């Protein structure tokens, strides 16, 4: 519903967040949003900024938004080519109580706590599952330096 999105937009205009910048791609279309999230501290994504593309369905908040990474990122739960995110919150665990901001916070949390058992990026997932966390973190840091700034 546009009213719900307008309410979220007004809240965002009145508050400033250090780790999330969230705004409509075009103020005349509240169904397309952009988010810039900062990589969480003490992770390979620290100091990176990552752009997300957010498409909001017309029956939002009853249905979740579709969110994809625009910025390339090396993470087991993010598809390397499409930017698709494997996060239950965006699929089966969605509830109308969530906002675009709270979903972005969940994505930041996913960067801190990857789920290697349900990978969209099998290479990243396999590194973690096989105990090569240093290898995973090294590649994730390299991608963050190359693309996340």
Swiss-Prot record:
InterPro entries: Ub_conjugating_enzyme, UBQ-conjugat_E2_core, UBQ-conjugating_AS, UBQ-conjugating_enzyme/RWD. Keywords: ATP-binding, Nucleotide-binding, Peroxisome biogenesis, Transferase, Ubl conjugation pathway. The keyword Membrane does not apply. The active site is at residue 86. Coiled coil: none annotated. It catalyses: S-ubiquitinyl-[E1 ubiquitin-activating enzyme]-L-cysteine + [E2 ubiquitin-conjugating enzyme]-L-cysteine = [E1 ubiquitin-activating enzyme]-L-cysteine + S-ubiquitinyl-[E2 ubiquitin-conjugating enzyme]-L-cysteine. Gene3D superfamilies: Ubiquitin Conjugating Enzyme (3.10.110.10). GO terms for cellular component: nucleus; peroxisome. Belongs to the ubiquitin-conjugating enzyme family. This is Ubiquitin-conjugating enzyme E2 pex4. It comes from Dictyostelium discoideum.
């Amino acid at each position: 519903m546009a009213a719900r999105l307008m309410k979220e937009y007004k809240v965002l205009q009145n508050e400033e967040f250090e780790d999330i910048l969230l705004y409509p791609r075009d103020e005349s279309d509240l169904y397309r949003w952009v988010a810039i999230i900062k990589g969480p501290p003490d992770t390979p994504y620290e100091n990176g900024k990552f752009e997300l593309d957010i498409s909001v369905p017309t029956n939002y908040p009853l249905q979740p938004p579709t969110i994809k990474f625009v910025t390339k990122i090396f993470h087991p739960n993010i598809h390397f080519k499409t930017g698709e995110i494997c996060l239950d919150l965006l699929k089966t665990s969605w509830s109308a109580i969530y906002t675009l901001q709270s979903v972005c916070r969940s994505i930041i949390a996913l960067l801190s706590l990857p789920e290697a058992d349900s990978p969209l990026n099998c290479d990243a997932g396999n590194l973690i599952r096989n105990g090569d966390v240093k290898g995973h973190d090294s590649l994730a840091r390299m991608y963050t330096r190359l693309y996340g700034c």
